[in-house]
């Protein structure tokens, strides 16, 4: 009987201490705006978390592989080291099952010939424990992977291609059978690849692609061309429209360089596009891309454009927009004004993920 009482007392004390520790940790975390969660080492260029579960997050490195934490960033472990490639360009999780992980390889944040190439796209059915190579070996660099929100067999891949000459294997690719076969659904020309891709959360047949003409050699970088800019599809990628027809820059009269796109989750009518041009230009549409308004030409939005050019929209506020560049920039009025915000870890801000179930949970790589 005495042993039983002691056991009960110890159990109660451990419960009290555990709850107290959790409350203390939550109090401390609640007072922090951003905290460094690692991992240290290589340049992180892709990031995503499991929606609704702050313990599970993934980070992809430019040439350092794929890393995962299951304790909110306290510990990280490599989960891609047994594969033939270590350059991670993009990550996405299936909305219907977050254990289904897709990874595009190769870096699209490029300013020199030495940037790491990839060898296609990979799929894990078990949260990164095992991997299957799903093709697209010659695409070179996949900067964005998007899994259809309700059908995990449908996946899109935005391929930039290599950067040293003409190539057929670039553009937007689509699979409808979980990667067993792929169809190139958007091809502009042999010198223009896909730098970004966004999907309308209310109508996944609507897609926006940011296309980029770039050539890099040992004596310099040539960014921009008539094929660059924003393209839109309303039929799941079967057909596309170059949105110079809606007033956006691009085409032979006003060629653009690297282009980023983002759609508001809370109001999918709102779409943003950021262009590398003479002065960076941030544009906004309030009607799914039918018409556009120039919001800003502030250089801060897009410094050193080929190396950055990525934007994100707050998940509960269509006027809340972020830009990843030399500085991490936020606007709360749709891009009219901006203010650089922390973190300033090393001057490299490449990617951002905001939890669709919790707008206060956000991560920047």
Each PLM stretch: what is its role?
Residues 16-18:
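N-terminal signal peptide c-region/cleavage motif recognized by signal peptidases
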Residues 1-8:
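Bacterial N-terminal signal peptides that target proteins for export
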Residues 22-365:
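Beta-propeller blade termini and top-face loops
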Residues 12-13:
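Short, linear, compositionally biased motifs with a strong N-terminal bias
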């Amino acid at each position: 009987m005495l042993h039983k009482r002691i056991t009960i007392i110890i159990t109660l004390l451990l419960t009290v201490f555990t709850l107290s520790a959790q409350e203390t940790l939550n109090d401390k975390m609640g007072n922090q705006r951003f905290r460094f969660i690692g991992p240290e080492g290589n340049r992180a260029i892709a990031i995503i978390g499991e929606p609704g579960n702050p313990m599970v997050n993934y980070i992809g490195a430019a040439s350092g592989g794929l890393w995962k934490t299951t304790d909110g960033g306290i510990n990280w472990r490599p989960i891609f080291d047994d594969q033939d490639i270590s350059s991670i360009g993009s990550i996405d999780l299936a909305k219907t099952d977050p254990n289904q992980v897709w990874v595009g390889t190769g870096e699209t944040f490029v300013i020199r010939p030495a940037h790491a190439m990839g060898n296609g796209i990979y799929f894990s059915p078990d949260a990164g424990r095992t991997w299957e190579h799903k093709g697209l070996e010659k695409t070179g660099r996949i900067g964005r992977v998007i899994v259809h929100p309700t059908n995990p067999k449908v996946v899109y891949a935005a391929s930039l291609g290599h950067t040293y000459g003409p190539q057929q294997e670039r553009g937007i690719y689509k699979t409808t059978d979980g990667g067993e076969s792929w169809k190139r659904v958007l091809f502009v020309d042999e010198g223009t690849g896909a730098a970004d891709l966004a999907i309308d959360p209310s109508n996944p047949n609507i897609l926006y692609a940011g296309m980029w003409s770039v050539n890099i050699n040992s004596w310099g970088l040539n960014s921009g061309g008539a094929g660059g800019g924003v393209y839109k599809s309303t039929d799941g990628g079967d057909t596309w429209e170059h949105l110079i027809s809606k007033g956006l820059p691009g085409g032979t009269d006003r060629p653009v360089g690297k282009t980023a796109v983002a759609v508001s989750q809370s109001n999918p009518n709102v779409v943003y596009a950021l262009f590398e041009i003479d002065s960076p230009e941030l544009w906004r549409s309030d009607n799914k891309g039918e018409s556009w308004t120039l919001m800003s030409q502030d250089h801060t939005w897009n410094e050193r454009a080929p190396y950055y050019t990525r934007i994100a929209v707050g998940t509960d506020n269509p006027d809340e927009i972020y830009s990843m560049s030399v500085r991490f920039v936020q606007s709360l009025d749709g891009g009219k004004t901006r203010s650089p915000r922390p973190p300033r870890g090393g001057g490299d801000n490449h990617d951002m993920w905001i939890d669709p179930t919790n707008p206060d949970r956000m991560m920047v790589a």
